[in-house]
Amino acid sequence: MESSLGSDLARLVRIWRALIDYRLKPLKLTQTHWITLHNIYQLPPDQSQIQLAKAIGIEQPSLVRTLDQLESKGLIVRNICSNDRRAKRITLTELAKPVINQVNQVINVTRNEVFYGLRVEEIQQLNNIIAKLERNIINLYNKT
């Protein structure tokens, strides 16, 4: 019996991302913007683009376009690193902090609505299963 779990999970991620994009539209932001801002906010100050790309789990060229957009919105600044002129350090602007709070509010409301009807134990169990699947996949990558 073939499982459609992989396809189901991929579809779930797509529609969840689309819902977040829709709800962030009034703020003129996307889910990709949120993930990037959230990671910049969570990481130690003045991360390089390379470090940020690794933290998010994407390639640096993919990140550059998003950073360009966030910079044009006045939410981040990129400065050349004094130790390595090829590297750029990313810093949130003062304008970003209230925007991050607004975005987090939208994300939290959306998450609560998505999880409506699920018990806390079910959500914890789902998180545990996802973590196990992720570990298995990472282990498979490490074997090759």
Curated annotation (Swiss-Prot):
Residue ranges the UniProt entry marks as DNA-binding: 49-72
GO molecular-function term, one example from the UniProt record: DNA-binding transcription factor activity
GO biological process: response to stress
PROSITE patterns documented for this protein: HTH_MARR_1 (PS01117), HTH_MARR_2 (PS50995)
Keywords: Activator, DNA-binding, Repressor, Transcription, Transcription regulation
Protein origin, superkingdom: Bacteria
Keyword Cytoplasm attached: no
InterPro entries: HTH_MarR-typ, MarR/SlyA-like, Tscrpt_reg_MarR-type_CS, Tscrpt_reg_SlyA, WH-like_DNA-bd_sf, WH_DNA-bd_sf
Domain HTH marR-type: 2-135
Subunit structure: Homodimer.
Function as written in the Swiss-Prot or TrEMBL entry: Transcription regulator that can specifically activate or repress expression of target genes.
Family, per entry: Belongs to the SlyA family.
Protein name as it appears in the record: Transcriptional regulator SlyA
Lineage: Bacteria, Pseudomonadati, Pseudomonadota, Gammaproteobacteria, Enterobacterales
Gene: slyA
